[in-house]
Amino acid sequence: MVFSSPSWVPRIPCEIPDSIPVGQFALEGNTSLPPQCGGRPPFVCAITGKSYSTKVLVDRVEFLSRSLAQELGWSPNEGEPEDKVVGIYSWNTLDFFALCWAVHRLNGICLPLHPFSIVPEVVAHMKRAKCRVIFTCQSLVANTLEAARELSIPGDKIYTTALPEAYLQNPEPIDQFKSVDQLIAEGEKLQRLPPLQWEKGRAKIQVAYYCATSGTSGKQKLAKITHYNFIANVMQVCMHESYAKNGRNEIAFGAIPLTHGYGLNIGHIMVYRGDTYVICPRFDMQLMLKTIERFRVERLYVVPPILAALAANPFLLDLHDLSSVQATVTGAAALDRSIAAKLNKLRPTWKINHAYGLTETGVVATLTSPHDVWHGSSGSLLPSFEIRLVKPDGTDAEGLDEPGEVHFNSPSCFLGYVGDDESNKNTFDEKGWLKSGDIGVFRKSPNGHAHLFILERIKDMIKVKGEQVLPRDIESVLLSHPAVIDAAVIGVPDELSGERAKAYIVRSKTVMEDLDEDDLADEIDEFVQGKLHESHWLHDRIVFLEKLPKSESGKVLKKDLKAMN
């Protein structure tokens, strides 16, 4: 059975544009809004209050593209897009989207690099993407220089974005690198570039972003998201939400890195429909609460751990005037229904909505509507999205309450992975539908509409604050410690982070034998912290065993470890 969006969801009323870049689509959508809907600044800095009008944003994109064309020797209609890849390794800035769209103006591809990424991850992504140009911010200059040295990228191919001065603490000197503002000032004096010459259908094959994702196979990959994929998803989300929004514009706050698919998606949507997106460099609870009061924020785009923190610490809700908030939208991880219910009790006027999707689906596939909230579900399908639930025997689920692996069909689904033919073969089924690796089931809401519930992931991946963490990455580090002879890692529930990694270890009887288990656990925890970033840390979640439960073939029985927990 093929599941589609409920009858109440408006259909996309026109053909999805396939001959323009996604930035041009978003900006043209904004400038064509009726006067009562337009005029709002698309982006506002949460710290300084600085903003640009849509007209100024359009100019900044154009000026920046001219300057980059001169700096890099690129022309809009010459050369291959794969040879024009620009990495963006930065905390959120006001010019993030101007930079992305300037690269697209030159027929290039953006490589968003998560600011939490450690140097080896940055190097791996840039190498796979054949990226030779990078923009960074002051607090990440040291990491960027280390990555550039390893990749033999010269200093004149490193540029900087601007973080608010009030936000910076002991910033690295960056005078030797040209900034976005300098490039824009130079570009204003240069001749206008020739327009992009895209034939019909070009946006379907032209990659806009190489987005990093852990993927369903358990290894980190770069997903090729086309301009058409993003345009389609913007239209899908906007049509789904139009049922409840009634053309009303909103001021929204995003607590997500713009380099994440979720953040990228929201930014394009905000501009297209004339909303205002208040941006902070990185999430800070106090800053978010102050920002809500200062800018009268109506909608919060967050990840579940943020709502969990608010539900667990109700006093936070009374520190500032949050009366403007009407809705929250969570994504990137599942929101536990108990947390939603608790927050709903604390703030009954807030509509707590959830979105579900993958980087590979162009981000959003299902979304809760304010008129049909059902805590624990992932909401209803967007228009032009189809899902099949494939059972272990390969047949499709034939109705409600019958689980199976979620397979997607949508104009927003990605092209494939960069340089990974094996994963590409395994990612699509025999019908060409995208396999999610998630087990889901459709159930009928109290209002009578089909909602998708995600039951579990097929693989052993752990989701920490929306980030997918691979147990084997932690296991590999543990096994490199001299006092560890065997190790296995599972995910365990965590109220604030969704999940956290927990390690079961068999210790050596001859190395560090003078340490008791508590001291050795502390030593191993510090060892892991020195090798991996925060989402992989173990803290007190280390248990010592005499031996790990294993099958006859030697495979660790993680289900037994989960039963112990």
From Swiss-Prot:
Q: Which pathway is recorded for this entry?
A: Antibiotic biosynthesis
Q: List the residue ranges of the region (SBD1).
A: 284-354
**Could you tell me which residues belong to the region SBD2?**
355-417
Provide any one GO MF term from the record.
CoA-ligase activity
Key words of the record: ATP-binding, Ligase, Nucleotide-binding
Q: Which residues form a coiled coil?
A: none
Q: What happens when the gene is disrupted?
A: Impairs the production of emerecellamide A, C, D, E and F.
Family note: Belongs to the ATP-dependent AMP-binding enzyme family.
PANTHER family given for it?
BCDNA.GH02901, LONG-CHAIN-FATTY-ACID--COA LIGASE
Please give the name of this protein.
Acyl-CoA ligase easD
Source organism phylogeny: Eukaryota, Fungi, Dikarya, Ascomycota, Pezizomycotina
